[in-house]
Amino acid sequence: VGEVHFAPGTVARVRTIDYFDGSGNLTLREQYDIRGFKTADEFFGQDGQMHYQALYRPDQTKYMERYYVKSTENTPINSLNRLINYQGHDYYFDTIDDLFTFFLDQLNNSTAEDNTFIADRPAMANNPVMDMMTPAKKLLWLPINHVAEGNDPVAGVLSGVYQQALNRDNIGRLDGLIVMTAQQKADLKKRFKRQIKIYQVSGGIAATGEPVPMAQRQSNRIIHVGRLGFDKQIDQVIQVFQGIHDQIPTATLTLYGYGEGADVAKFEEQVKNAGLEGLVTFAGYLPDTSSVYENAQLYLDCARIDGQPLSLVEALGHGVPALAYDYPYGPSDLITNGKNGYLIAPNTPTKMIQTAVKLLKNPARLQKMSAQAYELSRAVDAQHVWKQWQTIIKG
């Protein structure tokens, strides 16, 4: 028996085909690329867990085999990876990190240039980049806070994903760290002193389109863009909007982005209990949000912690004044208080409500802040961000 699953958002394009034995147990899953060719065979045991995987090229030649053993929790653990007939030889790797490092070294050797490798996914890329055997410039990009929430950024315990990479024995294997904000750069320089170079490069690039006047936007339209989770304190965004709506009945809130189903359900229940149905919209994920920003008059950010919120860069770049809690890291680098938005003390929704109402009731002030949002965003436009990268590439 075979069960065909189609790729979301397509018409009859196969994503997977599952095969079952006579007892209804999954035995084989074929994975397909959206372009129409098979990419993998995955074989399952009687316990329902994968034990072997074969990977294929577009011409259907097999290039890799991956083997799995059972953990104490009865989940599959990758125990061996076989790279088949690479330059006439088979190679065996105990872990995917070892395979990743091998790939990076092969890539590095494929050119005669002085190459730079940047690990930008801490859990996946830090160790493979640091373990490279061939000479190259190696840097880590820190997309999140380097310490756990609530810890001192200079002396506190490092976040788990950085404890190995940034310990005393390993940090000397790196040529630098890249962060997105001046505040985090300053904290890391205090922490590591002269042990390693710290670079700052904006993670977001502001748009450079024609300004859209506030009068052409939907009146009192408030937005938030990003992952919908309790760490982002979407519950407080809704709470703040409720306070705004009590004083400005025409105000609306639209939330763009995805989240865990259970979390989103709780936010929807909060909206229902507050009597805000029809005023708060969960719009889901959009690949292009330019029109969203250009029709909004105010952006709210009630998060506890972040690296540099991309949506805040985008909102300001589209002339949307922003109110954000002054958390580490991001808002204080992007918002000049009273110019393009306001920094609000964390977890003070009443203060954010008061600030938002005062601003929305003053169209002239709102328009001035929008113009300043466009102007100040030039500091993170494509030209300026490219100059930041040049200090790393040429340094």
Where does each model-flagged region fall?
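A short, active-site helix/loop in glycosyltransferases that binds the activated sugar's phosphate group
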Residues: 160-196
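A conserved mid-protein helix/loop that constitutes part of the nucleotide-sugar donor-binding site
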Residues: 220, 224-243
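A short, well-ordered alpha-helix in the C-terminal region of glycosyltransferases
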Residues: 250, 292, 351, 358, ...
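Glycosyltransferase donor-sugar binding loop
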Residues: 225, 253-265
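Nucleotide-activated donor-binding/catalytic signature segment of Leloir-type glycosyltransferases, i.e.
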Residues: 264-284
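Short hydrophobic beta-strand element within catalytic cores of glycosyltransferases
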Residues: 321-325
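Conserved acidic donor-binding segment of nucleotide-sugar-dependent glycosyltransferases
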Residues: 336-338, 342-349, 357-364
